[in-house]
Amino acid sequence: MSKFQNLLRSAVLAAIVIGAAFLCGLRLLEIQIADGSKYLAMTQSTHTATQDIEAARGKIADSTGKILNTNELNCSVKLQKASLESGTENEVIYRILTILMKHGDEWNETLPITRTQPYQFEKDRDNAVDSLKSRMKLGVYATVENCMNALYENYKISDQYEEPMRRCIAGVRYEMELKGFNNNNPYELASGISSDTVLELKELSALMPGMEISEGWNRVYLDGTTAPHIRGTVGAISADKYAELKSAGYKLDDIIGTSGIELALESTLRGERGTREITRNSDGMMISDEITKEPQAGKSVMLTIDSNFQNMVERIVQYHMDFLHSPYYTTAMDANLRGKDTEVGSAVVLDVRDGSVLAMATLPSYDINQLVEDYASVLNAENSPLLNRAINGEYRPGSTFKTITATAGLAEGVIDASSTINCTGRYMYYAPSYTPGCTGVHGSITVQFGLKHSCNIFFYETARRMCIDRLAYWANKFGVGTDLGFELPMSTGRMTSPELFDKLGIEWNASDTIQAGIGQSETLLTPLHLATQAMTIANKGVRYRPHIVKAVYNYDYTKLIEEIKPEVMADFSEGMEDVFAEVHAGMKRVSENANFLMEGGWYNIYDFKGIGKENVCTKTGTPEVIAMTKFNSTIVGFYPADNPEIAFGVCMENSEYSRHVACNIISAYITGEFNPVYDEDGNAVYPLGEKRKTADAEQH
């Protein structure tokens, strides 16, 4: 080949190379400059999701500032539908469950099928099983195997996942469906996860697009046995409640108050959610996390109760029942051992100066934390511990009602301070068809001694002279049969009347008026009504709204938002000074009769405890529950007699000597102590909880 040809070939080859390089350069220039933004977007495609930030729920504290219900930080795993690519759900769930299992963390699912083979329907979950079959479009006789196969097919869970992981994935998918998983409603797969789990999930988050770690709050109940009925609990929102509250901004995964103050003050305690925007690239890696709206914590509440006094009153009620059960309660004290089968009791203490609840005991009770962990065990426990008898137990008031009859009779003028009614032991006005008896033969007595001896005849006649309409009119002023305005849902009770009898389908007789006059017939009151009655008498006709909330604060109690002011519900004090002077004097005389066998002698219980019988106004009752066979024991009263500070109402079911409960409540209020005494076998030893006589205790 000639030299010229070689040069020509080299030139052509060089031209080709240069041309190719030029074309490549042009293309590179086009990519980098002309279409650079296009390809940058392709390599950095992003997705931004909005995530809620849970707000802390307000706290609940007692009157001293002791925290009762509070929060602790809770990390949870959530799935966001907008970030979860269709068809990858099972693999993402598999990866998350693997990490949860590795660190011993639980997850949320309620599939009514056991998690281990051989699979079985869970016991006592018939409704859930029926719902599962219906959702899977299976017949009522479908087996557990039919259900599992339907779940696998419905959610496309292949057999590449071994059992029982395959079943666990199915459980999560089913729960996601139940919870309405969608772009606006993330699914909380697990909550309360450990720090190790959080760390590993974050490290491997790129492999689990749609998975997010969320920080929220768990409700914590401190000292769970203190006033559980008052404080209440929170729980997951139900479908019905969600439908009701959706317009108020609630979501399906929200936690709401379910009982007590948690429920009653839901709108106060609930915070306002915040939001954050999380941006991820096409690989699922987080690019940015920006809070667009800060969450607002809920307001905190301070109650009127002092935990120490509340616990003392609960122990006092329990101790009284324990003593009536014990071998130290002898026939020398009570020939018939009345009350020995008592199991249930309640007591309410009010501040007469503003109506605030100082203590509200109801027994049997429970531990809130046990309720949260094992609801069924508390629900099914003997004597219904979930029932707040202090506000929802309805009882005949018995002779405690005679204080109302006395007030009404004096105010109506059918009796006065010097009026006497002759008690022969039998009321003869309706003879011979109806001749109800009395507890004794008291002779000719005034209203003060009518109260002291609890003379049925005196109050039969007083009620008859008034007629039922006027008696009911005055009873209403004391709150009988009315809504007291209390924060928690409660019974209104009821007052005997012809209208009530008509509703109950009972024939009304004129003689029913006299039974109403002694707190029998169809009159029913709660212990809070009894305490309110006593407060109204102590205040000589002024009835405050009983309330359990003292104040509302910001979240950390550093700023007072609202202080609850006393609210007068009824005021009939004008011109009633002389009327209440007689009623007070009669109630003092009742306290003079409060004697019991202690340490070998009969002592006045109020003197024995150093209170002084002259300082206490009380009225006891023994209302019939079953005619002449079963009785409750009630008492209303206030202390001190002349300048009252507290009022109380007590009802002990199937019991006796509720005055012992009242005496110990007053003593605990004065001293800040209650000292129960039990022997080595757990028997309550002394009637009033201690073997201590004061210098004022005199034998009677």
Could you tell me what each predicted segment is?
Residues 327-339, 598-608, 676-693:
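Surface-exposed intrinsically disordered loops and tails
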Residues 319-326, 363-366, 589, 671:
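Conserved helix-loop functional segments at active or binding sites
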